Amino acid sequence: MDFYKSIALDLEILGPQATDSLKELAYHRLEDKIVRLEFRPGIFVTEKELADSIGIGRTPVREAIQHLATAGLLSVLPRRGIKVSEVDALSVLRLLEVSRSLDIAVARAAAIRATSIQRHEFSRLAEEFDSVSASNDSVAQIRLDSEFNNLCMLAMGNEHARKMCRLIQPLTRRFWFAHH
C-alpha cells in the first residue's frame, strides 16, 4: 500500500468524521513533503507555494496550514509568513520518551484486537520489511513504518491514542529524515 493509498484508506475509515476530505488530503500531502524535507526546516513559504506544490486549492490548504501549525511542523508568523519549523533534537528526544510508552500500549492492544484481515496485513508488512531492510531505501523503510503504525492504530481501535500518535509520528519521522 503506497502512502497516498494509505491516506485514502484513512479518509474512508474516518467516514463522516472527515467533513472536508480535501483539507485532510492537503494536510497529509503537505505533512509528507515537510517530513521528507522537501520544504527545508527554517524556510518561509507562501500559501500559494504550498497549494501549488500539492495541486490543491488554497482554501483546504489554508485549513491544513493551521493543523500543521498545531502539530508543530509549521509556524504562522503574523506579517512575516509561514515558516517550516526547525528540527530540534532535544524536543524530539523528549517526544521519543512519550512515544515509546504509547507505541508499546498501541502494539499490545493491536495484537489482541486485530481482525484476521489486519493480521494478514501485518504479515504482509513484515515480509515487506524483511525485503526492504537489506536495502538502504530509507523512503521505503519510513513508508512501511508509517503503514505499520497506521495499521496498529486501526487495529487498536482507540481514537484517543490515534490522535496522540498522529501528533508525534510526523515529528519523529522528520527528525529521522533530517539526521539519517
Give residue ranges: language-model regions.
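Short linear motifs at protein or domain termini
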Residues: 1-108, 112, 160
